[in-house]
Amino acid sequence: MHPIRKKRLTIVLFLVAGIAIAVGLTTYALRQNINLFYDPTEIAAGNAPVDVRIRAGGMVEEGSVSRDTDSLKVNFRVTDYAASVPVQYEGILPDLFAEGQGVVAMGRLNEQGVFVADQVLAKHDENYMPPEVAEALERSSKGQHKSADVEKAAETTAY
C-alpha cells in the first residue's frame, strides 16, 4: 500500500471512530434525561418502571390531599377517572395546585406502588391541561363522554 493512501486510511478510520464515540456518548447522555409519561391507569396496571424517573399526570382526586402539620410533606392521589395513584411529595406546592385540577408530577414509583414526586407542576389557567393529561383523560372512561374541560384542554396545547 502506498504511504499516502495508508496515511489517508488511518485518518479516515480515526475520524469514523471519533464520530462513533461521540454519537455513543450523546445517545447515552440523552437516555439518562428522558422522562417518560405514564397515566394513573398505566401505573396501576404495573406498566410503569419501578425506581426509574418518570412523569405521572392526571387530576388531583377530590378529598385526597392530606398535609403533614410538622413538615412540608403532602400526600394526594392523581386520577384519570379510571384509576388513581397515591403520590407523596415533600416541598412547596405550586400556587395553582388544588383538588380537581390537572397536575404533572416528576419522580419515581416505589415498590409499594406509591409515586414519590420530587417536582409537581400545576396547570397555569382554567382552560389549559398538559397534552399528555388530556390524552390520558380522553382514553379513560370519563373521557369517552368527552367532557367540555377535556375538549378545551385538547385544543389548548401551548406550554
From Swiss-Prot:
It is a single-pass type II membrane protein. Residues 135-159 are annotated as: Disordered. It comes from Marinobacter nauticus (strain ATCC 700491 / DSM 11845 / VT8) (Marinobacter aquaeolei). Keywords: Cell inner membrane, Cell membrane, Cytochrome c-type biogenesis, Heme, Iron, Membrane, Metal-binding, Signal-anchor, Transmembrane, Transmembrane helix. The gene is ccmE. Residues 136-159 have a biased composition (Basic and acidic residues). The chain crosses the membrane at residues 9-29. It comes from the Bacteria. Residues 1-8 are cytoplasmic. It is found in: Cell inner membrane. This is Cytochrome c-type biogenesis protein CcmE. Residues 30-159 are periplasmic. Heme chaperone required for the biogenesis of c-type cytochromes. Transiently binds heme delivered by CcmC and transfers the heme to apo-cytochromes in a process facilitated by CcmF and CcmH. One of its GO terms (molecular function) is metal ion binding. PANTHER family: CYTOCHROME C-TYPE BIOGENESIS PROTEIN CCME HOMOLOG, MITOCHONDRIAL (PTHR34128:SF2). Belongs to the CcmE/CycJ family. Heme binds at residues 124, 128. InterPro entries: CcmE, CcmE-like_sf, NA-bd_OB-fold. GO terms for cellular component: plasma membrane. One of its GO terms (biological process) is cytochrome complex assembly. The keyword Transferase does not apply.
